[in-house]
């Protein structure tokens, strides 16, 4: 029986609907008010009533307004043309919305996610008579720098036989590409695009693998000490102004991945505008073209309705899974998951659910876990491998890592990059705290060597805390040298200048080379007459290595500085 309903209550963006018929959880409905149709999603079903969260401002909705039930879940449209686009959480292209509406978006206006008129040059790889299943490739088109595979829609559950496929040529996303036949003789038309529900993980692959290949970000502190694996998960919690957004932008520019998906979820409009302005101007170091050519941005600012924040996170992960099915490596950056959790808290309060810690819903952990679990490395039907790596920034109030969102995230991620106010105020960027952060993945340097270096950082911090109480004269010269060595490692290796053309991105080879130099220095037993001599010598080493960091690797300037460094160390009768 087709469902029918009317509005019987409105609280903020939560609308209660009295209905007759059959509905399903997460079904999309349209509320008719003032000549507009406002999209909403059913989030609770009770006897004769449903509660729906509205993705628009609810001003003007009145008791008695008609509600149209679609019998469909919230979906995204998948096909060529997603890259270099900027969407809102409901996959409306924002540049086209701006053309239609101006600076202030009208509610109830929904546009097609893909350009219906653009023609793509299709190259067929399958042929008539081939047997196929969901996720198999029929052909490809060139999308920017990516070989965009045209696939059998993921909702096809059986094996099919191709009975018709078009020849190479130019087609739109709505043109018929192939006709397939099921075992019962039913025929199905395939186009370049199809829809997929955002809250349902894509499972059209053979098997999942354990992430073990390092995703090189070219940021020294991450790749060496707190690495991230392709298909892994990581979180970047930190207070406001600690550098989360810049770190994510640097990662997206330099990471060893094919495509970057950015979900700007509930961030301040200023930060989102900064991202939208900067990304088209950034040069992709791999291709020399604009970084936007392999980027898709899903943005919902804090001024947009809270329900759309959740939609933006799920839209981003679904698009990531779609490109993963082509055998590509995808990096999804969600900024910030705290805003999404706050939206859940707001909706949970309106539903009058029993609250958990700090009034967040009791199911917060399971929802966050289900999002991060959609990351992973998979083997596709044809044997190729694709991955989705998920990195979420968390914005705990006051930098308090004990709050529920951070704690729920820490339980499910494989790496923790904790930014601290202390390091950002000291202008030590990236402001990742080397004492609190951790990773479960393998890095670019041997584990034993990095643990030895981390032990120096811990010991150096202990000496530093002691000196704050008793002063420099209150510690032995040996402890003082340990402190100086830890500061040397911090300033020369853990810190990095994101705005320098050389130091912004450090290759795998260079990281290994420079770490080995510092590792030997940490292991060396220096003999000094007094603390003044120790400080002077270590400062000379520091300046020399900092200059090396800014010099092109193994070129004339770098080689000269390396000779100077070796001469400095030999002056202490050390064999380098």
Swiss-Prot record:
Enzyme Commission no: 7.1.2.2
Function field: Produces ATP from ADP in the presence of a proton gradient across the membrane. The V-type alpha chain is a catalytic subunit.
GO terms classed as biological process: proton motive force-driven plasma membrane ATP synthesis
Protein source organism: Borrelia recurrentis (strain A1)
Keyword set, alphabetical order: ATP synthesis, ATP-binding, Hydrogen ion transport, Ion transport, Nucleotide-binding, Translocase, Transport
Reactions catalysed, as given in the entry: ATP + H2O + 4 H(+)(in) = ADP + phosphate + 5 H(+)(out)
Family: Belongs to the ATPase alpha/beta chains family.
Pfam families, alphabetized: ATP-synt_ab, ATP-synt_ab_N, ATP-synt_ab_Xtn, ATP-synt_VA_C
Gene Ontology cellular-component annotations: proton-transporting ATP synthase complex
Enzymatic class: translocase
Protein name (database record): V-type ATP synthase alpha chain
Claim: Signal is one of the keywords in the record: no
PROSITE patterns for the chain: ATPASE_ALPHA_BETA
Signal peptide: none
Annotated positions binding ATP: 238-245
Keyword Ion transport: yes
PANTHER family to which the protein is assigned, alphabetical: H(+)-TRANSPORTING TWO-SECTOR ATPASE, V-TYPE PROTON ATPASE CATALYTIC SUBUNIT A
An example molecular function term from Gene Ontology annotations: proton-transporting ATPase activity, rotational mechanism
Primary gene name: atpA
